[in-house]
Amino acid sequence: MLFRSVFTMGDNHKPANIAKAAIEHAQKNGNNLVILDTAGRLHIDEDMMAELEEIKNTVTVHQTILVIDAMTGQDAVNVAKEFDEKIGVDGVIVTKLDGDTRGGAALSVKAVTGKPILYVGMGEKLSDLEQFYPDRMANRILGMGDVLSLIEKAEAELDIDEDKAKERDRKSVV
């Protein structure tokens, strides 16, 4: 199981102190993975950037992943560039690609930062996080659609329906 608990200290604490306490809490409880999720930003906010720098200076961070909203368009490039310059980004997740956004910002972010796009968000659930495939994104941007992802989703649904049918058949024999 990936998520065991959520650590919180409330709103009246500095983010760096919360990060430090969260890691200490995880270590005491035998957790070997801590995800520090900070406040979202659609534009550069100097105070929030300073908070991120303070977190990186307070705790040992093994990987920094920037989550970009595809609907912000080309402004995502400015955000990604600033984040990478200020705190260093190891990879990118692009969200909200389930709408009518084509995702051109994703490739621009990759070009500007040189950092890999790790995943794309195709909905609001954790299960809607999909591995990033550059060729599929290129087809989407060119208006050709993402036929392979559509086929994979259909196959997954067929597998689920087949499993349900087998279970139903098994129960009817009893």
Please provide the spans of the model-predicted regions:
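Conserved phosphate-handling catalytic cores of large alpha/beta enzymes
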Residues: 19-23, 27, 31, 43, ...
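Short, acidic/glycine-rich phosphate-metal binding loop used to engage nucleotide
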Residues: 11-13, 70
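Conserved donor nucleotide-binding strand/loop of the catalytic core
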Residues: 5-11
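Active-site beta3 strand of CheY-like receiver
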Residues: 35
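Short, small-residue-biased leader/transition segments that mark boundaries at the very start
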Residues: 1-2
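Short glycine-rich anion-binding loops that position phosphate/pyrophosphate groups of nucleotides
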Residues: 39-41
